[in-house]
């Protein structure tokens, strides 16, 4: 994802980032700019990747909003699109 230019790490690999104001802002506003939290804590079984609060992925504002509204990670959203 980083090599494709679709992902950004907003902090060093540091779990304390989730306690910072920047993380709170991202959680509240990232979808407006088309970003999703790529590896949420409650989706580790689906993503097969440990929670990474610093790692965000660009999917576009429309898709980011829909994914957040549905409560889906990227893997779940792709599966949803394939079946609907």
Give the location of each predicted region:
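Catalytic cores and adjacent binding grooves of peptidoglycan-active enzymes
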Residues: 1-84
């Amino acid at each position: 994802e980083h090599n494709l230019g679709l992902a950004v790490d907003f902090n060093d690999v540091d779990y304390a980032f989730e306690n910072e104001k920047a993380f709170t802002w991202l959680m509240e506003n990232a979808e407006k700019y088309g970003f999703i939290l790529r590896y949420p804590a409650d989706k580790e079984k689906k993503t097969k990747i440990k929670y990474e609060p610093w790692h965000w992925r660009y999917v576009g504002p429309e898709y980011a909003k829909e994914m957040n509204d549905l409560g889906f990670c990227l893997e779940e959203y792709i599966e949803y699109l394939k079946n609907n």
